[in-house]
Amino acid sequence: MLIDSLHISFDSFNFESILPMLVLVCGGIFTLLINAFTSRFSRNLNMFLCMLFLVLDFLVVLGLEQQENAFFGFLSLDTLSLVSQSIVLISAFLLIFLALSKERFNEFQTAEFYPLYLFIIAGFQFMVSSNHLLLMLIGLETASLPICVLMALSGKRYGLEAGIKYFTMGAMASAFFAMGAMAFYLLTGSLNLEVITLYLYTEGVTNPMLFAMGVIFLIGAIGFKVSLVPFHTWMPDVYEGNNPVFASYISIVPKIAGFVVATRLFGAFIDTRIAWVEDIFYALILITITIPNLIALWQEDVKRMLAYSSISHSGFALACVFIHTEESQKAMFVYWFMFAFTYIGAFGLLWLLKSREKTWDERYDHPYSKFDGLIKTHPLVAILGAIFVFGLAGIPPFSVFWGKFLAVESALESNHILLAAVMLANSAVAVFYYFRWLVAMFFNKPLQTQSYAESDIYTQNATMPIYAVIIAMALVCLFSVFMMRGLLEFVA
């Protein structure tokens, strides 16, 4: 028979393995019911419930023991799963703090936002823990569909456009994933990754056509989710159409989930040592690191620049997946951990400076001219911005430098000299567009008069929780060197 008989033993159920997801699913349902049976919506109550369930979930994850096969073999509670769940939950917790702003933007004033936010995180937790293609697809859909809704909650044209684009690209990615899973099911008779990997190791590629179809479709699906070139075109517009809080969310959380899935999926493909498979990954990495870097040089809006730089950072993470060693896996987690904290801080800064009026540009919310002379009008904000610029540019000893250092080191140790050279060259290119933001803040003259600056239009969205998150992220970025030992032990 093509398919082995299905034997279900409740000894392998392991209820604890799905407890983190159940916490958030139950939390989302509870929050939904609270809103349904209360006459008046309370943003503070909803945010408190969100934070409470995220903290409970994080504590549950910390208490889990590693187990290779759980929940009837569908889940794997390995280091990859537990570390990525931790990064997802920490990022989600920090980002929900940024919603505590003075300006009452529509998306944070709706009862639907908060339960959907919890459902999204639960979906990503299923994705990073799954050892089965079907459950990965379910987690992908559970996370993707609510994201489209949250994008459109602003009610603005650009928000609706972003939601439609994300939905369209997400539907295409899901279709690609389903087609790739079908190809490997026909090839191996299973959707379980362990069975697929074992089949490829022992039997080899018995049907090159099915193998090629599966690899190409799955690369396309993951490529859309983590915005690899040439699947990246939706991302800058989606960034532009969303507020900085949600833009930072979609640049961090879905991508870490996508790269964990890529690590589980693509490791088996890379280990086949088939030349064209390696060539595809090599080409994807090179163009994903390089092309967005060059496009970012010509952007006039800081948010769009950060969108393209995020795509380039995805190329560095994919390089770690491609190298496929224990050291490169550590490098990927360190890279994305540092990237997440720095991006939360940078986008928190944009959120701090966001206003309803497009005072500086008819189209863009955050053109470079908005930051001209910020050191004179708001010195603290400018200094925080400089820290995040140094971190994103990979200037030692700031945050992302350590991720890039480990990525390049793992490439050199694996004899990928060209890959290491491309990463170093593009790191140098990235300095130019990051420092353009720095120059605007520190060396350009303010466009507005001093009396206009004193009207505090730059920080009319500021609150103490937002300042607290941004300053905390700046401290992490600044003193990341002291975190490296503990972080490497955590991801080991």
UniProtKB/Swiss-Prot annotation:
Name the reaction it catalyses. Answer: a quinone + NADH + 5 H(+)(in) = a quinol + NAD(+) + 4 H(+)(out)
Q: Where in the cell is it found?
A: Cell inner membrane
Spell out the GO cellular component terms annotated for this protein, sorted alphabetically and separated by semicolons.
Answer: plasma membrane
Q: Which biological process annotations from GO are given for this protein?
A: ATP synthesis coupled electron transport
Question: What keywords are annotated for this sequence in UniProt?
Answer: Cell inner membrane, Cell membrane, Membrane, NAD, Quinone, Translocase, Transmembrane, Transmembrane helix, Transport, Ubiquinone
What role does it play?
A: NDH-1 shuttles electrons from NADH, via FMN and iron-sulfur (Fe-S) centers, to quinones in the respiratory chain. The immediate electron acceptor for the enzyme in this species is believed to be ubiquinone. Couples the redox reaction to proton translocation (for every two electrons transferred, four hydrogen ions are translocated across the cytoplasmic membrane), and thus conserves the redox energy in a proton gradient.
Q: Which organism is it from?
A: Helicobacter acinonychis (strain Sheeba)
Q: Which Pfam families match?
A: Proton_antipo_M (PF00361)
User: What is the similarity comment for this entry?
Assistant: Belongs to the complex I subunit 2 family.
Q: How does it assemble?
A: NDH-1 is composed of 14 different subunits. Subunits NuoA, H, J, K, L, M, N constitute the membrane sector of the complex.
Which residue ranges traverse the bilayer? Answer: 18-38, 45-65, 80-100, 108-128, 133-153, 167-187, 209-229, 250-270, 277-297, 305-325, 333-353, 381-401, 415-435, 464-484
Q: What is the lineage of its organism?
A: Bacteria, Pseudomonadati, Campylobacterota, Epsilonproteobacteria, Campylobacterales
Molecular function GO labels: NADH dehydrogenase (ubiquinone) activity; NADH:ubiquinone reductase (non-electrogenic) activity; quinone binding
Please give the name of this protein: NADH-quinone oxidoreductase subunit N
Q: What class of enzyme is it?
A: translocase
Q: Does the keyword Protein biosynthesis apply?
A: no
Q: Major location, coarse class? A: membrane
Q: What topology does it adopt in the membrane? A: Multi-pass membrane protein
PANTHER family to which the protein is assigned, alphabetical = NADH DEHYDROGENASE
